[in-house]
Amino acid sequence: MDIPPLAGRTVAMSLGALPVSYVLNQVSAFSQPLCVVLTSALVLGLLFMAVYSLSHGEITYDPLYAVFVVFSFTSVVDLVIALQEDGYLMGLMDFYAKEGEPYLRTAHGIFICYWDGTVHYLLYLTMAGAIRKRKRYRNLGLYWLGSFAMSLLVFLPGNILGKYSSEIRPTFFLAILYMLVPCWAGMRIFNQSPAPSSCTCDVVQEEQKKSLLQRPADLTLIVYLILAAFFTVFRGLVVLDCPADACFIYIYQYEPYLRDPVAYPKLQMLMYLFYALPFYCLAAYALTFPGCSWLPDWALVFAGAIGQAQFSHMGASMHLRTPFTYRVPEDTWATFLLSNLLFALGPHLLALRCLWRPAFFLRAAPPSSPQDQGKKQQ
């Protein structure tokens, strides 16, 4: 399989975050929040100008190239912050974690940084490499879009509503501008033409004639979607303070992190309740009735969103930065990990199913009329 190479120029620019972080950390003036936000904007502006001057051809071909290069730089910064907060690095991003975005020092913030510095970073390099080679990256872009949007939709409101709301810095308003990026990038990615399907009309018609019992993989996914929907409703009721005994036992013995006043876990469960739950129902419908051509794209977006959300939620639930009373008890680790890993795995299996065997979701060609058949015979 021909995999797009990682863009070497993008790697070099992104790794420039290391010396830049070290130099800025040595300047005492950056102990002021206003200096931090102005410097951050200046660095990103200079980086964008450098990308534009060095890669004008790529940006002309696809403006998202500049976004991926700049964001790869910020991904390295996020990875440095996460490693520094966990004690693996020292003296690189102290000023930003203290005066820029102190909520990145929470357990949830640390795992957002880990995800951005690893998964997002590899996606940026791969998509930038695909643009340089003029190859398709639509599927990777959809996965990134869901992941990036989910992290913002939980993290930014959580900073305002949680116990760290009093520590909002001017840099927070710079982060709000990031919300415009997935909107614009999403429109461009969705407007890209999908890869041409190799399924013939006969294959599509034959696949769509099969009943659900003749498609055991789809039947298994539907059962999973139903169970995941019930689990989503249950955890939504838990964070909404449902007085049922089952909710009380769950929040104290299995996921006490849902009570943490940082607000991120509550917002995450509400995001699941209001957005993931409808998708589970619609996806089960699309696996039952043929021709739902929207599912393959949205399954990728949803897989990215759930992957990022579950990684951050599971990591923060067990991280030492979370107060002991809100951490998962050691005797329930197995149940917690199994249920949450399955919750994260299912959407990825759904996306893979849609990519590998898309015939069931394609719109069947209308049957040819007798006149058309007569013309073909002539």
UniProtKB/Swiss-Prot annotation:
Keywords: Endoplasmic reticulum, Membrane, Repeat, Transmembrane, Transmembrane helix. The keyword Membrane applies. GO terms for molecular function: identical protein binding. Residues 61-186, 217-351 form the EXPERA domain. InterPro entries: EXPERA (IPR033118), TM6SF1-like (IPR047195). The chain crosses the membrane at residues 34-54, 63-83, 110-130, 140-160, 170-190, 219-239, 269-289, 291-311, 332-352. One of its GO terms (cellular component) is endoplasmic reticulum-Golgi intermediate compartment membrane. It is found in: Endoplasmic reticulum membrane; Endoplasmic reticulum-Golgi intermediate compartment membrane. It is a multi-pass membrane protein. It holds the Pfam family EBP. Belongs to the TM6SF family. Regulator of liver fat metabolism influencing triglyceride secretion and hepatic lipid droplet content. May function as sterol isomerase. This is Transmembrane 6 superfamily member 2.
